[in-house]
């Protein structure tokens, strides 16, 4: 490829990202949510609780298992809210019904019709920013934890014990903390700001822009990082999106690709993982 073609391609991509930034700032961020059910109450004094937030996407079953496992194993007062970024209205209705069933908050996020196809990471990132700035920032929580919709707690966990010697909790992805298991004290976030968008210039996925807020120049070896151990349901298939999951910090199970956005075919995998979760829940009844 000639130098001129590379320059033109680079400029085209730069223009796309600039346009996305403009629309996000002046259009998306100013939109009202499409629907709210018992959303987080804003204002008031800081309380001893953790705001747990999840961006759901086209899968209601994982949301219900996440609620059940958190209520069983999360050993600190928390408020849990589902921020629905689903593109399938039927799935959104199912997720809302589950939230009503379990009496947890639900917010249907604004549409993102301005995003080109293939910008799922950007979609997730601006959804995370929207939920934090609109609902969490002034919600009065002592801690904030952001979860992927297909991650489940499978053993006792106390968020208040994670910050004795450091300011964050989570797994390192590249040069930042993965936003699927991401937690900090609220006063730290409010001091430095937060940005969960991916970064074109850093070649980073969702959450990469937080590098500039928290992690630039950090000596990672001085901090405890959540271990991410890959496990497979069948030895004959090493595709983690179709046949595997991660065990994180010995107490979190991350499914990978639960909504099958990669088109791998995950029905068998998810049924087996749900069976594993049922066993965990029964053992502690």
Residue ranges and their predicted role:
Residues 2-68:
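N-proximal low-complexity "stem/linker" segments adjacent to membrane-targeting elements
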Residues 121, 151-216:
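Conserved catalytic core of nucleotide-sugar-dependent glycosyltransferases
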Residues 6-11, 15-27, 205-285:
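C-terminal catalytic/acceptor-binding lobe
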Residues 68-78:
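Short, acidic, metal-binding catalytic loop of nucleotide-sugar glycosyltransferases
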Residues 88-141:
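Active-site-proximal specificity loops/subdomain of glycosyltransferases
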Residues 70, 131, 159-163:
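A short, amphipathic alpha-helix embedded in the catalytic core of nucleotide-handling enzymes
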Residues 140-152:
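Short beta-strand-to-loop acidic/aromatic patch adjacent to the donor-nucleotide binding site
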Residues 84-86:
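Acidic ATP/Mg2+-coordinating residue in the GHKL
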């Amino acid at each position: 490829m000639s130098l001129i073609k590379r320059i033109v391609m680079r400029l085209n991509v730069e223009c796309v990202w600039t346009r996305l930034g403009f629309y996000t700032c002046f259009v998306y961020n100013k939109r009202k949510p499409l629907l709210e059910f018992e959303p987080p109450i804003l204002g008031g004094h800081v309380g001893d609780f953790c705001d747990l937030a999840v961006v759901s996407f086209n899968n209601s079953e994982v949301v219900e298992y996440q609620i059940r496992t958190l209520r069983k194993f999360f050993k600190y007062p928390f408020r849990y809210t589902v921020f629905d970024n689903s593109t399938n209205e039927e799935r959104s209705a199912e997720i809302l019904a589950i939230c009503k069933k379990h009496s947890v908050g639900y917010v249907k996020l604004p549409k993102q019709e301005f995003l080109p196809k293939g910008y799922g990471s950007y979609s997730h990132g601006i959804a995370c920013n929207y939920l934090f700035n609109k609902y969490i920032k002034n919600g009065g929580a002592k801690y904030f934890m952001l979860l992927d919709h297909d991650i489940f707690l499978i053993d006792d966990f106390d968020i208040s014990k994670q910050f004795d010697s450091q300011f964050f909790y989570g797994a390192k992805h590249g040069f930042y903390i993965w936003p699927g298991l991401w937690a900090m004290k609220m006063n730290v976030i409010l001091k430095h700001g937060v940005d969960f968008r991916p970064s074109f210039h850093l070649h980073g996925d969702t959450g990469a822009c937080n590098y500039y807020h928290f992690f630039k120049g950090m000596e990672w070896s001085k901090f405890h990082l959540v271990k991410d151990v890959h496990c497979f349901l069948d030895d004959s298939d090493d595709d983690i999106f179709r046949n595997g999951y991660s065990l994180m910090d010995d107490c979190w199970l991350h499914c990978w690709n639960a909504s099958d956005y990669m088109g791998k075919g995950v029905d068998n995998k998810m049924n087996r993982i749900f069976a594993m979760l049922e066993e965990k829940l029964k053992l502690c009844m």
